Amino acid sequence: PQCESETNFHYDIPPGYKDDVLVDVNNMSPSLVSDTQKHERGSHEVKIKHFSPYIAVCVTTFSLAFCCFMVHAAITRQPTHLLPFFFIQVFDLIICLIHILGFMSSTSDIRLVIHTKTGPIYIKSTGLTFIILSISCMMLAFKAYCLGMVWDCYKYLMLNRRGNLLDDWYSDQWGHLSTFWSLLRTGRNRGNNSIGNSGSPNEPNTRPRPDTITYDPANDLPKYEDILKIRNAYAPPPYYCSNTNGNVNTTTTDAVTTNTTITSATTANATTTITTNANTNTSTTTSVISPLTTTNKDDTQINNASSNAHSSC
């Protein structure tokens, strides 16, 4: 009786296609149908036994933790806290791509599962492939869009942290990829739809650029390009122009005249001092020579007197 019920159950299943070959379940023997059903039930039970709720709880916990890190990074402007969630998104994108490739390689098995349902749905292989490909492309596009948003947020926080805000900081994003990624970027184009820009979308961005780049010693060392962008980094000293430095020239002339006067006065004083010293030396010499002359005269008189005495004797 059990075999008859199982056989009647399989008799209600409509015929299906597998690998483009007609498989009629009605023409199969009852023993083959029973063995096939037992094998399918056994494989289903093995799949259920291999499922562990602890793994699901761990994956859910880590996902929530990474989401909390992402929210904390966006609020406190910490770009490094976005990296765990970014890596999770990259891993999810790769896993989704592998699943899509697996579905595309087993399209015939999916058609057989659809045909063996209680409510039969007949669909061609081309239509099923198109539906699976469309859904897969939409899923990949959405995941890639979210991944690009997280990466843009990370770059914005890094540039904002360094104090080097640029208008076209995202211009080289996805530049080496195809046009498909450029279409995805239209939704997050901050150049024409930025906050505070009241112009039309076709007008270029008119946000004021920063005049100078300041360097905070508390952060890491600046780049060579940032140093070159600093105003008057290697500028020569200012030149003296005729239209703006006339007073400076006048002051310089007055200073030269004053120096000439001081030099003349110094020269005159030096000349007077030298003359005075010369006169003093002359007087001293005269006074010294006068006693010597007097002494010589006295000696001459003494000598004359002694000679007269000898002659008288």
From Swiss-Prot:
Post-translationally, this protein is described as follows, namely: Phosphorylated on tyrosine residues.
UniProt KW keywords: Cell membrane, Membrane, Phosphoprotein, Receptor, Transmembrane, Transmembrane helix
| Bias kind Polar residues: ranges | 301-313
Its main localization is membrane
Start and end residues of each stretch annotated as Disordered:
192-218, 279-313
The UniProt entry, under InterPro entries, shows: LAPTM_transporter (IPR051115)
Residue spans of biased composition, Low complexity class:
279-295
Please provide one cellular component term from the Gene Ontology annotations of this protein: plasma membrane
Topological domain (Cytoplasmic) residues are 76-82, 151-313
The compartments listed are: Cell membrane
Residues assigned to the Extracellular compartment are 1-54, 104-129
In the bilayer, the protein is annotated as: Multi-pass membrane protein
Q: Where is the signal peptide?
A: none
Q: What else is known?
A: Specifically and strongly recognized by a serum from baboons vaccinated with irradiated parasite. Potential vaccine candidate molecule.
> Any idea what job this protein has?
Cell surface receptor that binds to human complement C2a protein. This results in inhibition of the classical and lectin pathways of complement activation, probably due to interference with binding of C2a to C4b and interference with cleavage by C1 or MASP2 such that C3 convertase cannot be formed. This infers resistance to complement-mediated cell lysis, allowing parasite survival and infection.
Protein name, as recorded: Tetraspanning orphan receptor
Q: Gene name on record? A: TOR
